[in-house]
Amino acid sequence: MKLDIINREKVYSRMESIPNGRASDVIIPGCLVLEGGAFRGLYTQGLLDFWMQNDINFQTVIGVSAGALSAAAYMSGQIGRSARVNLGYRHNSNYIGVKALSKAHSPIRLDFLIHDYDQIEPLDMERFHDSRRRLVVVATNCQTGPSSLKRATALILSWA
């Protein structure tokens, strides 16, 4: 599948200003909790990029919904990755909108983020699985209702 940005005239005009690079290997003891909130998560992602640029890499991260997706990029140490996909593909009907709704029964296709976009900018799985760090995601059981905490692994990411 070739991924192009649809509606090129609507591409984020400051894509080149999004930071790029890798976070250092410095790990800070402590826990960070990232809430969800769909595209409000862009603010969180910008803060995480700033922290990674300044060697603030927490040992444990708990993510809920969009916060879990932001946490995956943070744990992989990929500065700017979340902003690039969300700002670069915000007008792509394979990612968001009616076409996405018809494919994924949701206005945002999480499988696009996890599978399709990963072909363009792969998540650094070696860094993601750094044994010094821990990522926990909150998952809701759609059949029973209660939520539970799950240690994030590549397997859990592939469920989306």
Give the positions of each predicted feature.
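A short alpha-helix-loop-beta-strand transition element characteristic
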Residues: I120-R134
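Internal, conserved structured core segments that host functional sites
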Residues: R132-T153
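Patatin-like phospholipase
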Residues: K2, R8, V26-I120, L149-A160
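Intrinsically disordered, low-complexity segments enriched in polar/charged residues with Gly/Pro
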Residues: I18-N20, L48, L123-R127
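Small-residue-rich anion-binding loops in enzyme active sites
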Residues: M1-P29, C142
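Short secondary-structure boundary/capping segments
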Residues: R22-S24, E126-H129, A139
